[in-house]
Structure formats: structure tokens, C-alpha cells
Amino acid sequence: LSDYDEEEDERAKATLDAR
């Protein structure tokens, strides 16, 4: 669960950065 949450957070950050 922790790993998944961390990965999701990183992906969300990348998406925001791309925007």
C-alpha cells in the first residue's frame, strides 16, 4: 500500500509538472 501510494504521488507530480 505504501509503495502504491508513493508511486501514485510521483505520477501525480509528474502530471502536474507536464501541465
Curated annotation (Swiss-Prot):
Principal place of residence? secreted
What is its subcellular localisation? Secreted
Which positions does the record annotate as the modified residue Sulfotyrosine?
Y4
- What GO biological process terms are annotated to this protein in UniProt? adaptive immune response; blood coagulation; innate immune response
The alphabetical list of record keywords is: Adaptive immunity, Blood coagulation, Coiled coil, Disulfide bond, Hemostasis, Immunity, Innate immunity, Secreted, Sulfation
User: What's any one GO cellular component for it?
Assistant: extracellular region
Modification after translation is described as: Conversion of fibrinogen to fibrin is triggered by thrombin, which cleaves fibrinopeptides A and B from alpha and beta chains, and thus exposes the N-terminal polymerization sites responsible for the formation of the soft clot.
Q: What the record says about its domains?
A: A long coiled coil structure formed by 3 polypeptide chains connects the central nodule to the C-terminal domains (distal nodules). The long C-terminal ends of the alpha chains fold back, contributing a fourth strand to the coiled coil structure.
Q: Any idea what job this protein has?
A: Cleaved by the protease thrombin to yield monomers which, together with fibrinogen alpha (FGA) and fibrinogen gamma (FGG), polymerize to form an insoluble fibrin matrix. Fibrin has a major function in hemostasis as one of the primary components of blood clots. In addition, functions during the early stages of wound repair to stabilize the lesion and guide cell migration during re-epithelialization. Was originally thought to be essential for platelet aggregation, based on in vitro studies using anticoagulated blood.
Q: Assembly and interactions? A: Heterohexamer; disulfide linked. Contains 2 sets of 3 non-identical chains (alpha, beta and gamma). The 2 heterotrimers are in head to head conformation with the N-termini in a small central domain.
Which named protein is this?
Fibrinogen beta chain
Organism from which the protein derives = Tapirus terrestris
The gene coding this protein:
FGB
